[in-house]
């Protein structure tokens, strides 16, 4: 298991990753490697045909001062593509009103392969094409992404 957290409030632009900048629980097996701020490499190094991981994302998010109050969302991305089932949406009633999101995805990596995993601010208004998404959100410090090998 490995866990990475943010140490300060972050302004994250639409379709960008959350910068996890501190290792809370290090991975001692070499299966999870941070390669960039907010991007993790997960390895499928195993004697089996695959390695399976549970990736959990949690944190508090809000529309920053000066932003438009719309639905905001975070999702888990694998190799840059957001997993639709992992998108967690929060609809604030006012600017700077924080809401907690928690989501997870199960990711299967074939033996000998790797995948990049990240948490991304995505459009929470895509069900309403007439609404323009907020260009950026605030992600409160102590947001975390946890990677746990389950098979």
Specify the residue positions occupied by each region the protein language model found.
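Extracellular jelly-roll beta-sandwich "head" domains, especially the C-terminal globular C1q domain
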Residues: 1-151
């Amino acid at each position: 298991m490995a866990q990475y957290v943010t140490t300060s409030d972050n302004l994250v632009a639409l379709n960008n990753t959350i910068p996890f900048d501190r290792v809370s629980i290090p991975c001692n097996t070499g299966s999870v490697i941070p390669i960039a701020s907010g991007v993790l490499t997960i390895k499928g190094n195993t004697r089996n045909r695959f390695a399976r991981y549970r990736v959990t994302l949690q944190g508090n998010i809000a529309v920053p001062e000066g932003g438009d109050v719309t639905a905001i969302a975070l999702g888990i991305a694998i190799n840059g593509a957001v997993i639709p089932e992992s998108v967690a949406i929060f609809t604030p009633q006012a600017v700077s009103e924080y809401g907690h999101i928690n989501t997870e995805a199960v990711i299967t990596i074939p033996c000998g392969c790797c995948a990049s995993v990240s948490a991304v601010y995505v459009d929470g208004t895509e069900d309403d094409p007439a609404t323009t998404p907020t260009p950026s959100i605030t992600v409160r410090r102590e947001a975390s992404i946890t990677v746990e090998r389950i098979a």
